[in-house]
Amino acid sequence: MAKKVGLACDICGARDYTTMKKEDVSIRLELKKFCRRCNAHTIHKEAK
């Protein structure tokens, strides 16, 4: 079953996005998304 995880901006730390992730995957998710605080496309990493 999948669980909901938050994505935090790598630069400023803002948590703008949530997504679903399978529980059996141990690698932390990294996606390039738009950050409203930085006003740019940045890497967003899975937050704890």
From Swiss-Prot:
GO terms for cellular component: cytoplasm; ribonucleoprotein complex; ribosome. Keywords: Ribonucleoprotein, Ribosomal protein. GO terms for biological process: translation. This is Large ribosomal subunit protein bL33A. Gene3D superfamilies: Ribosomal protein L33 (2.20.28.120). The lineage of its organism: Bacteria, Bacillati, Bacillota, Bacilli, Bacillales. Disulfide bonds: none annotated. Transmembrane segments: none annotated. Coiled coil: none annotated. It comes from the Bacteria. InterPro entries: Ribosomal_bL33, Ribosomal_bL33_CS, Ribosomal_bL33_sf, Ribosomal_zn-bd. The gene is rpmG1. Belongs to the bacterial ribosomal protein bL33 family. GO terms for molecular function: structural constituent of ribosome.
